[in-house]
């Protein structure tokens, strides 16, 4: 049978919820076959991050030039920094039959939903907003004012859960990883995704 087109898997949630940690755990699993779509950002690189691995880090001017050239599936400005997803890599990789894993902010996910309505949208939620605050404080990288700004934004983002297909609570990283992998596996078994291939197989068998 023909190769099935890959899924676009969109993981997003509030800043500090642990999206990057869960994503890294997924890709450390030897059974993972997803292709990671690296986002582009204008924010400062954090300790331990690598350009071209965690993000493509760009200046604001360079990022805005790419916006004008329509080179993003989505982009958003969040807490003073741009984040965006380069478009061509995602399309080409899905056409080759690979699942593409996209870790982005909630505003960006809204734009992806418009352009890729058949994508799989997963919201990574904190056990509570207080737990989220503790994670942000624990980073030790931001002022109290910036942390409060992120908490206020998180409240709005939690109210936007209805844009997503699934919600996974990140109460423990390994559990969150397993839940996401199970969701993706089940999505591949949906009738809508496999029916056309089997209809073609049946027609060919009748010839």
Curated annotation (Swiss-Prot):
The keyword ATP-binding applies. It holds the Pfam family Guanylate_kin. This is Guanylate kinase. It catalyses: GMP + ATP = GDP + ADP. Residues 6-185 form the Guanylate kinase-like domain. GO terms for cellular component: cytosol. It is found in: Cytoplasm. Its EC number is 2.7.4.8. Keywords: ATP-binding, Cytoplasm, Kinase, Nucleotide-binding, Transferase. Essential for recycling GMP and indirectly, cGMP. Belongs to the guanylate kinase family. The keyword Flavoprotein does not apply. One of its GO terms (molecular function) is guanylate kinase activity. HAMAP family: Guanylate_kinase (MF_00328). NCBIfam families: guanyl_kin. SUPFAM superfamilies: P-loop containing nucleoside triphosphate hydrolases. ATP binds at residues 13-20. PANTHER family: GUANYLATE KINASE (PTHR23117:SF13), GUANYLATE KINASE-RELATED (PTHR23117).
